[in-house]
Amino acid sequence: MSIIDQVKQTLIEEIEVSIRKANLAEDIPEIKIEIPKDPKNGDYSSNIAMVLTKIAKRNPREIAQAIVDHLDTSKAHVKQVDIAGPGFINFYLDNQYLTAIIPEAITKGDRFGYATQSKNTNILLEYVSANPTGDLHIGHARNASVGDSLANILIAAGYNVTREYYINDAGNQITNLARSIEARYFEALGDTSYEMPADGYNGKDIIEIGKDLAVKHPEIKDYTDEERLKTFRQLGVDYEMEKLKKDLSDFNVHFDNWFSETSLYENGAIENTLSKMKELGYTYEADGATWLRTSDFKDDKDRVLIKKDGNYTYFTPDTAYHYNKINRGNDILIDLMGADHHGYINRLKASLETFGVDSDRLEIQIMQMVRLMQNGEEVKMSKRTGNAITLREIMDEVGIDAARYFLTMRSPDSHFDFDLELAKEQSQDNPIYYAQYAHARICSILKQAKEQGIEVSTDADFSKINNDKAIDLLKKVAEFESTIESAAEHRAPHRLTNYIQDLAAAFHKFYNAEKVLTDDTEKTKAYVAMIEAVRITLHNALALVGVTAPESM
């Protein structure tokens, strides 16, 4: 529990004791402690007096006064309590207690802000899962950035997280990929009798694969059609996945598992899943197809599992896959999906309910669209290729750090305009530059301090820190752990980028108002230790969203 959370908890406990002493209520409602928007209203505030009005049957200001009269403030660093407006209780703290965060941050280093105890909860987080049929585009990039950041944050908050990529290597799109490669393969051998599929893949990469295979594997031309299709399917997927993994790795996005859809067919998981659902009485035959009674579990209609032609729908392997996830001992499943998958939420949740699995254990977060903007206009196509802009091109254009940060700093359920020009600016208007510059500026000051013989020390006299801007900065540092917890709980990495901006702003304000290296040696030592705590916090926060913290810029 962070220092700030400890203070809040102490205030809640003391208010509860005061309410009982004043005989205001036996069953006490939830007591909330908030940070006022206006610092003039204190460091913390509670509206409990208004909440108790109906229970105590008294004027809220009278209730507030009764609470204050019985309040023991000695344990919570309170120096003043006021009653404001209709009955708000405002607490003004002796903020010297905040300096305890400095040695804590310095001592914990790279682990500062992280939970010290495991939540003993296993989460399987699936993200990206793009079809291995071409390059990753800007939508995949947002999914990757948010997914990887969320995984980092959940781990920091004490969850056990498995990062998984589901390889869609068994559907019709892979057959089309194989037939496209086949046409380019024979074309490279001078045989143009093999036509591209109507919905085939016409990218330059497919032409290159065909040429490469024609040189390295001329024997494939003599295979039977079935053998050739199987070979091109596997080689095509392998080629695309190798390229995709390289792009994701360079984007600082990582996975623990690469789960193949084909494996669900090969190990009998799909057949076993269908048998289980039939055994439980949730399947039925109608119109020549096999259906699942998903409407029994809040889906708007039942869903087809096996079509009239005997082939599975896309829903069938997806159902088997999610049942497999549960059977691997995961407590919570989180899927990050594109906006076009919104209709999948209820049917997937319903499919788990058929197995007696609480559908609340499956969380599906829909990622909204990203528009790339340049000079106020949307950029839809690459000038180089004429195709959709790829993740690789985004990384090359603005850099990995800027791409990661920009794609994470908005709520994933909101549409986002990615300003390519802003992402490249070296100014305080650019959020990532502003944050990284704060870190680099601190490193520069620490270097100067060291040259003057002043080292970072946890034994400095922190009573020297009494400047308002310094206290505001320490408050932000003290909020780091609770921000991680909040971002994890709400599956919201953008809460952390918002925090990073606030922390950087607090540092820049302090820097502009106060000199760190002064003639007062003791004060300088205290400030040097303080900005090292800020540096550690910035470094750790940026790392959680996959961004570097440069020492110079």
From Swiss-Prot:
Family to which the UniProt record says this protein belongs: Belongs to the class-I aminoacyl-tRNA synthetase family.
Q: What class of enzyme is it?
A: ligase
Q: GO:BP terms for this protein?
A: arginyl-tRNA aminoacylation
Q: Which Pfam families does the record associate with it?
A: Arg_tRNA_synt_N, DALR_1, tRNA-synt_1d
Q: What is its main location?
A: cytoplasm
Please give the SUPFAM superfamilies that the UniProt record associates with this protein.
Anticodon-binding domain of a subclass of class I aminoacyl-tRNA synthetases, Arginyl-tRNA synthetase (ArgRS), N-terminal 'additional' domain, Nucleotidylyl transferase
Report the GO molecular function annotations.
Answer: arginine-tRNA ligase activity; ATP binding
Stored CDD domains: Anticodon_Ia_Arg, ArgRS_core
Motif 'HIGH' region, residue numbers: 130-140
**Which cell locations does it reside in?**
Cytoplasm
- Entry EC number(s): 6.1.1.19
Keyword list, A-Z: Aminoacyl-tRNA synthetase, ATP-binding, Cytoplasm, Ligase, Nucleotide-binding, Protein biosynthesis
Taxonomy of the source species = Bacteria, Bacillati, Bacillota, Bacilli, Bacillales
- Gene Ontology annotations for the cellular component aspect, listed alphabetically: cytoplasm
Question: What is the source species?
Answer: Staphylococcus epidermidis (strain ATCC 35984 / DSM 28319 / BCRC 17069 / CCUG 31568 / BM 3577 / RP62A)
Which protein, by its recorded name, is this?
Arginine--tRNA ligase
Catalytic activity line of the entry: tRNA(Arg) + L-arginine + ATP = L-arginyl-tRNA(Arg) + AMP + diphosphate
Record text on subunit structure and interactions: Monomer.
Classification via InterPro entries: aa-tRNA-synth_I_CS, Arg-tRNA-ligase, Arg-tRNA-synth_N, Arg-tRNA-synth_N_sf, ArgRS_core, DALR_anticod-bd, Rossmann-like_a/b/a_fold, tRNAsynth_Ia_anticodon-bd
